[in-house]
Amino acid sequence: DIDALIQELQDRGKAITKTALSDATETEFRQKTVEAFTDIFSYIKENERFFSVLFNGRSSYSFPLKFNTYLRGRLEQQVQTKKNVIPYEHWITAVAFAYQGMIYSWVTNGMKDAPERMGEYGYYFISQSVVEITRGT
């Protein structure tokens, strides 16, 4: 019947889409991760004076914690682990603080690298972290 044919076409379409996405997973992961990190670094660069003041050591302690919460949210959107070698909560917290340290270093050293380059560095850091956390899967 027609409903069965339509269902079969839909199932085949889903299978093709799933295969296409699985073939492009690494490329998509790289692209989305670099874009997300570049967006963050571009925003910071556009607001250089503001962030320089925040990271000068005399700013409110609550800013780093709030900023870390924001970074965790961005990272969780980009990364889904398969099998955790360490508990996910510990891993994502450590990665977010490490990434915040990268931003701090970039800002306090005069933002010499372009935001796009920092986005690449962010991708490299995250991709290596994902390899480690999913080792053995």
Cite the ranges covered by each PLM segment.
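Amphipathic alpha-helical packing segments from all-alpha helical-bundle domains
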Residues: R58-K82, I86-F97, V131
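Hydrophobic alpha-helical connector segments
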Residues: K18-R49
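HTH DNA-binding helix-turn interface
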Residues: D1-Q7, D11
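A short secondary-structure junction motif
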Residues: L9-A20, N47, Y70-Q78, S129, ...
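Hydrophobic alpha-helical segments that form the core
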Residues: I86-N109, D113-S129
